[in-house]
């Protein structure tokens, strides 16, 4: 069993969030590349959305799961893209109700190990049927170390905002901390029920602490100290699959966007995008656009229509439309983000700090402005701005979390000014990190190590 040629049969059952499904499937492809067989458990009508990403169809097979009906859950809903954000707890409740089906499937498949995330009941189920369980996270280990560390947990004591504003006592980088408004949101999650009668905080803590091992898509060069901290705190082996970098796009940019970007000089355009699931309030949406306008630079903003507005057009004040005519585009549909970030005219990326978006930014030349909205995005922003110093975060009010057009403009100008101390620092750090991430041997090195640690775990 300890030979290098040993291969295993693995099951994967990720949370029904789009980013979680694609993140797990990326790992499935990497493991299949090492010869392992993967059974990927997925809602039956969602399977078609991942089939085109299957690089090893002879080793990766889909196992359809029927999502149970739950009162309040839209009929046919299978992923987070099918339900409004306030209803995602119902989707979690539905996933929890698949427990008996999952037990039957895993017994029938005769797998050696199951990878999971939000299903906190899977480790005990796995032990019951004699297989190992590995918690695989699509978010940063720093997030788990900061928010979930066992040294934070005192029996009978509720975590407060003040607790969450500072790092745990033995955290490796005490300079990383939360602002008051951010700590308030994190503290709320410690009491917020998420699927049945369990809080989101307790669900994830149980999922992590009951596992046989923890796995992350990162590398020691970026988050090594936080991985060591988690390994010590949870007393679990930590497996690193290497950073989740974007696969080079084989498509070409739409001609209309290529023509528009081509009108501007190299490195002069701001590209702003907040992902497929982030919707801003109308006042924030407008303030962000006013901030981009205030820079005096051309910009392309790919944003969803805000709350309280039926369309992008209806959300933009007439005065702003006049000011940005010819040098600013606000687009409400999907665009080829990788191709925008690669375009020579784009010099700055204003991001909501989703990890996939930041990974795309890190392997390109554009400078990074960080404007996180919720949850792990906040921690991602601290990694980029405080730990790695490769970007600048937009300043917000300590208590209310509100940003201004002036703070947006200030952050953009800071990274775009090559002569300023901040501009030189983030550019230099970004250049070094990009060179490291683009090393052709990086992925194989980490997957060799991941494979060996997995063999050690499975015996």
Swiss-Prot record:
One of its GO terms (biological process) is pigmentation. Keywords: Glycosyltransferase, Transferase. InterPro entries: UDP-glycosyltransf_plant, UDP_glucos_trans. UDP-alpha-D-glucose binds at residues 138, 335, 337, 352, 355, 357, 360, 376-377. CDD domains: GT1_Gtf-like. It is an enzyme of class 2 (transferase). Pathway: Pigment biosynthesis; anthocyanin biosynthesis. Belongs to the UDP-glycosyltransferase family. This is Anthocyanidin 3-O-glucoside 2''-O-glucosyltransferase.
């Amino acid at each position: 069993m300890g030979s290098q040629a040993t291969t295993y049969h693995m099951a994967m059952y990720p949370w029904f969030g789009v980013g979680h499904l694609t993140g797990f499937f990326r790992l499935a492809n990497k493991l299949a590349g090492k010869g392992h067989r993967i059974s990927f458990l997925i809602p039956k009508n969602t399977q078609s959305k991942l089939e085109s990403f299957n690089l090893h169809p002879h080793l990766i097979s889909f196992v359809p799961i029927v999502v149970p009906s739950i009162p309040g859950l839209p009929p046919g809903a299978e992923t987070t893209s099918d339900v409004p954000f306030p209803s995602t707890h119902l989707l979690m409740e539905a996933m929890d109700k698949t427990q008996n089906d999952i037990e039957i499937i895993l017994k029938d498949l005769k797998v050696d190990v199951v990878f999971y995330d939000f299903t906190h009941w899977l480790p005990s189920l796995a032990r019951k049927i004699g297989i190992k369980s590995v918690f695989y996270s699509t978010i940063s280990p720093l997030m788990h170390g900061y928010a979930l560390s066992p040294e934070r947990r005192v029996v009978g004591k509720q975590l407060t905002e003040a607790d969450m504003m500072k790092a745990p006592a033995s955290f490796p980088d005490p300079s990383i901390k939360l602002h008051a408004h951010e700590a308030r949101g994190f503290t709320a999650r410690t009491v917020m029920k998420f699927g049945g009668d369990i809080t989101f905080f307790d669900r994830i803590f149980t999922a992590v602490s009951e596992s046989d091992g923890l796995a992350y898509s990162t590398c020691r060069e970026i988050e090594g100290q936080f991985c060591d901290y988690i390994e010590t705190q949870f007393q679990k082996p930590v497996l690193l699959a290497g950073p989740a970098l974007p696969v080079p796009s084989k498509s070409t940019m739409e001609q209309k966007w290529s023509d528009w970007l081509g009108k501007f000089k190299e490195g002069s355009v701001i590209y702003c995008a907040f992902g497929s699931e982030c919707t801003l309030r109308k006042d924030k949406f407008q303030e962000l656009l006013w901030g981009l306008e205030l820079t005096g630079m051309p910009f392309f903003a790919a944003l969803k229509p805000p709350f309280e507005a039926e369309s992008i057009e209806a959300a933009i004040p007439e005065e702003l439309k006049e000011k940005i005519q010819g040098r600013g585009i606000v687009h409400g549909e999907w665009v080829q983000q990788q191709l925008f970030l690669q375009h020579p005219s784009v010099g700055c990326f204003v991001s909501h700090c989703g990890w996939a978006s930041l990974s795309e930014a890190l392997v390109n030349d554009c400078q990074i402005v960080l404007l996180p909205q919720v949850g792990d995005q906040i921690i991602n922003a601290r990694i980029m701005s405080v730990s790695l110093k490769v970007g600048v975060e937009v300043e917000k009010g300590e208590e209310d979390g509100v940003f201004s057009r002036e703070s947006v403009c200030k952050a953009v100008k800071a990274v775009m000014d090559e002569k300023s101390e901040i501009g030189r620092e983030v550019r230099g750090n970004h250049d070094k990190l990009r060179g490291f991430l683009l090393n052709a041997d990086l992925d194989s090195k980490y997957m060799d190590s991941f494979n060996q640690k997995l063999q050690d775990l499975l015996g």
